[in-house]
């Protein structure tokens, strides 16, 4: 099992990427996330692979760090599952963990955090 976080920086165009991107890089590095396990794509979207036990911690950490910058926020989905194809680029990898993260991200609407796992009962408890 793996955890996949798919995230999007809210109001990223209002703040210089030098500020939020460097903060994001430093935060992930300090949290011990290897650079090969995460990627920024489409300018302000992020995807990272982690152990399931670390996924919620990293999600909360990214949220807390992002909220330190005025007018900035982050919306994210955490997917738990297998990774059946691992590419050099995180965004080109695939499997149920990525699918769960993508499905949860697409369903966010006005929410800023959702979790989707193989266990429906678990999802219902976490997604209040």
Please report, for each region that a protein language model flagged, where it lies by residue.
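Regulatory and interdomain segments flanking nucleotide-handling catalytic cores
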Residues: 1-128
